[in-house]
Swiss-Prot record:
Name of the protein in its database record: S-adenosylmethionine:tRNA ribosyltransferase-isomerase
Keyword annotations: Cytoplasm, Queuosine biosynthesis, S-adenosyl-L-methionine, Transferase
Pathway it works in: tRNA modification; tRNA-queuosine biosynthesis
HAMAP family: QueA
Molecular function as annotated in GO: S-adenosylmethionine:tRNA ribosyltransferase-isomerase activity
Subunit: Monomer.
GO cellular component: cytoplasm
Role: Transfers and isomerizes the ribose moiety from AdoMet to the 7-aminomethyl group of 7-deazaguanine (preQ1-tRNA) to give epoxyqueuosine (oQ-tRNA).
Family: Belongs to the QueA family.
Amino acid sequence: MKVSEFDYELPSELIAQEPVEPRDASRLMVLHRKTQRIEHRIFREIIEYLEPGDLLVLNVSKVIPARLYARKKTGASIEILLIERLEEGIWKCLVRPGQKVKKGTELVIDEDLSAVCLGRGEDGTRILKFQPQDDRLIFEKGRTPLPPYIKNEVPLERYQTVYAKEEGSVAAPTAGLHFTPELIEKLKKKGVQFAEVVLHVGIGTFRPVKVEEVEKHKMHEEFYQVTKETIKKLRETRERGNRIVAVGTTTVRTLETIARLPEQEEYVGKTDLFIYPPFEFKLVDALITNFHLPRSTLLMLVAAFAGKDFVMEAYREAVKRRYRFFSFGDAMLIL
């Protein structure tokens, strides 16, 4: 399958530069897979599509302030993006411009914090040892790691879901950005159940698909965790005959990863599961997601879930109706 089959025309003004206020006022496109029908709603109206006993599964990973600005002793500016914590104060990072950072290169963030490059990691990353080796201090100096297509500065808390709690992501699981505490409360009152997973969004988010054929793309591993409590809720939902509704593609990848492993009480590990058409979904019955970049692995996952032709038609419709796209954009519910 060609990556070009997942391309579409997107006018740049439809790339959302800031989030909607309140969060649940964003638009919601509803895709009905059985009837191939499309509806246009507001996100807070999602409550009408969820039944008592349905299970909403949230990724509670929290975005870290992963972007740092440093200088070499020569005065050259270097941008650092924290990717993965290896141990306290030692991080796998992306650095720009990369050719200027070699083993032994010293980087000064400010008078309180510096770093030295210990060497190269895979896929162009660098291993940086910070001085002092204090993650709290590193985070104090860091800024929101917004994607490159967002030109505005946005405070970190607004690039965070209201339920985020496990630090580790370098990009937000954006489908969850539309939920407010009030909407969650209303859903609970209706009898909708909630469960949590963790998947720390990593370097894969920043890496475009560079191959021509979908099958040749390799996903980067990302850390995930599913607790005993969540496993119990998933099992009970299945037994009741209710739906498991994944909030975001990261939740889908976590659930479909554990669905392919031997049964356990709880799961923790790394996943490089790449979901593209055709794919047999074993746990996820419905999906809440945003509108994704052309040719991206996220769009391929959505196409695998709802059917490629239907999804590409929905995206053309979204462009025509001036939906807002990407991280701070509008949402889609696939039933």
